[in-house]
């Protein structure tokens, strides 16, 4: 017809997609039209693939037009050159799912991500080079990063918006301005590699705390600078900090905190819905682009949690007091946020997927199977290593979990000799100590640095050392695990260690069921508050004739102390009710079955609720309500999460 211009239709067809910054009007342009994102963070590594679609759809129905996710390098390259991108690690499938639901993606591929994730996503094997300076232009570090980006980024390229995919912007590094190295050559290297793999038209950006000193080392010409801050901060001031770095262009809060992180032994954090609503409305009214961190927090399954310094590990739950709970449930915060978005944008009509039903399967009796020591031949299939002085986890190529250190007492030690890692605080992170199978007590990094023990010359001294999660933020992310210094006993330095890296996962998956009955020869009573680390197993059946089962549930540990739990071989993470605030662990239904009994395996490291010698059973309980905010009696360390919160503009106590 008249005025028909074939070239015009072609360029605006599905083939020609652009996403760019309009500097003259301080906004984004998507396919030439003004655009603003309202986004939420969800980490695919913290939500089972089974639930990705459910969580993403709930985010879409809240009115979000984008999601933001991190790519944890260590989740995908557990050993050098060994890559995992299938099942729960299938990041491409996750991003395609978001695309299918009409959600855009803000991708944060690191290589460092912080995220309260083990070592901020950096693989522990980087530490095999002892002098390595992480997050800098150290050639050893850059070589590993370069190889990784060469694997990851080509997978991301077809998913870029320009190429018909959902990814509109890509973050380079993560809050680099908060790190001591301040190495612009490193940022330049990343910029070059990102451009090489993703092309020149992709929008690259950085994120830093909204203080000028953070943007000094965190920004680079050619990377669009954004800020992050929470509910207590002064929004005008925060965006002025961004304006100093980027006088023109869209205002962006890349991490607007809907809640905050927890540590074992500290109170559970919450942020009031009213505070979230008022800051969110204010930012949206200014035309700002906002990503809510987190919109859906999820779970640190297995050993993936991080830690902060002075050393304090984060718990298994990463609920974050976010609008969607750890189990993906709708909260009042969800509906309040949706209402705010409705004032500014069109929110999808239709039915919001409901919270998933939970089922209380009740008490499950477990019997004690074997102590760790009694199961060494199964747990340590790779064999042990001998060394004059202790080796770290990395030196025996064990990245997660547990290593047993054994030596013999060089002489008789009567009435309480001091076993100690002083002055080095060298137990990273907890050691469960026994002599000839008699439990002695626990050493704990930064908390319990010595222990009185006694024993005869030639007796076995065993320290089972647990890696409780690597530091993920700040200067001390090169966090070695195991015995990282010598141990002294009285005035002797202990030598001639045999070191057993334990393959707990393999043992639990393949052998536990077949282990012969309980071995009670190690039944010497130790101090009443501490018994030998041991495995307990039991099972429960879910009747197949009840429709809709299995359903999600939560496991709690009445009377238990601290340990690790698996259901049907799936590592649910750490429990520590003795410390709190988390008392229950989330159990997603896809790991349960109705066709056979469900196996529960517990590795209790300190003390189970039944005698170590008697035949009586211990029980765990499957309940339908989570408890992640129990009161805490433990004395917290001086201000870790509060200090961090303050740095992120979360200073207004009314927000908590």
Task: For each feature predicted by the language model, list its residue ranges.
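Carbohydrate-binding surfaces of carbohydrate-active enzymes
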Residues: 142-156, 163-172, 177-179, 183-187, ...
């Amino acid at each position: 017809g008249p005025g028909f211009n074939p070239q015009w239709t072609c360029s605006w067809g599905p083939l020609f997609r652009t996403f760019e910054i309009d500097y003259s009007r301080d906004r984004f342009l998507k396919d030439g039209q003004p655009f603003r994102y309202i986004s939420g963070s969800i980490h695919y590594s913290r939500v089972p693939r089974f639930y990705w679609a459910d969580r993403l759809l709930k985010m879409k129905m809240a009115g979000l037009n984008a999601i933001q996710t991190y790519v944890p390098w260590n989740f995908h390259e557990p050993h050098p050159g060994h890559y995992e991108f299938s099942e729960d690690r299938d990041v491409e499938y996750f991003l395609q799912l978001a695309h299918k639901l009409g959600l855009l993606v803000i991708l944060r591929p690191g290589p460092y991500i912080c995220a309260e994730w083990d070592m901020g996503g950096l693989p522990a094997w980087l530490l095999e080079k002892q002098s390595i300076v992480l997050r800098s232009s150290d050639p050893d570090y850059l070589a590993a990063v370069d190889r990784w980006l060469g694997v990851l980024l080509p997978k991301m390229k077809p998913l870029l918006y320009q190429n018909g995919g959902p990814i509109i912007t890509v973050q380079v590094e993560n809050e680099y301005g908060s790190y001591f190295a301040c190495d612009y050559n490193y940022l330049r290297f990343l910029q070059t590699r990102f451009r090489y793999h993703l092309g020149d038209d992709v929008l690259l950006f950085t994120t830093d705390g909204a203080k000028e000193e953070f943007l000094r080392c965190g920004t680079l010409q050619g990377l669009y600078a954004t800020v992050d801050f929470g509910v207590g901060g002064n929004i005008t001031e925060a965006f002025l900090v961004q304006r100093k770095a980027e006088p023109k262009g869209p205002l962006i809060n890349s991490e607007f905190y809907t809640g905050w992180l927890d540590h074992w032994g500290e109170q559970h954090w919450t942020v009031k819905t009213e505070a979230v609503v008022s800051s969110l409305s204010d930012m949206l009214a200014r035309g700002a682009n906002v990503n809510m961190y987190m919109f859906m927090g999820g779970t640190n399954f297995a050993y993936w949690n991080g830690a902060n310094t002075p050393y304090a590990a984060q718990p298994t739950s990463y609920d974050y007091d976010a609008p969607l709970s750890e189990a993906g449930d709708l909260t009042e915060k969800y509906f309040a946020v949706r209402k705010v978005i409705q004032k500014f944008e069109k929110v999808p009509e239709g039915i919001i997927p409901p919270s998933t039903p939970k089922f209380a399967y009740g008490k499950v009796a477990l019997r004690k199977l074997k102590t760790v020591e009694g199961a060494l031949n199964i747990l340590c299939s790779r064999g042990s290593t001998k060394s004059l002085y202790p080796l770290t986890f990395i030196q025996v190529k064990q990245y997660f979990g547990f290593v047993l250190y054994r030596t013999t007492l060089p002489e008789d030690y009567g009435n309480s000799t001091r076993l100690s890692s002083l002055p080095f605080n060298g137990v990273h992170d907890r050691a469960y100590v026994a002599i000839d199978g008699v439990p002695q007590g626990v050493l704990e990094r930064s908390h319990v640095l010595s222990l009185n023990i006694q024993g005869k010359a030639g007796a076995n001294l065993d320290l089972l050392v647990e890696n409780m999660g690597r530091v993920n933020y700040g200067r001390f992310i090169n966090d070695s695990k195991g015995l990282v210094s010598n141990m002294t006993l009285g005035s002797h330095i202990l030598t001639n260690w045999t070191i057993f890296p334990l393959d707990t996962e393999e043992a639990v998956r393949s052998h536990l069921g077949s282990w012969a009955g309980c071995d009670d020869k190690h039944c010497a009573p130790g101090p009443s508050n501490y018994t030998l680390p041991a495995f307990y197993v039991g099972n429960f059946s879910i009747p197949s004739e009840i429709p809709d089962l299995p359903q999600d549930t939560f496991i709690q540990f009445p009377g238990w102390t601290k340990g690790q739990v698996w259901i049907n071989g799936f590592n649910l993470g750490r429990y520590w009710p003795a410390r709190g605030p988390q008392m229950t662990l989330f159990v997603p239904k896809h790991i349960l079955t109705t066709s056979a009994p469900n196996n529960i395996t517990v590795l209790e490291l300190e003390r189970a609720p039944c005698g170590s010698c008697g035949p009586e059973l211990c029980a765990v309980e499957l309940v339908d309500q989570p408890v992640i905010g129990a009161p805490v009696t433990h004395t917290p360390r001086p201000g870790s999460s509060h200090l961090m919160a303050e740095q992120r503009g979360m200073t207004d106590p009314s927000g908590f």
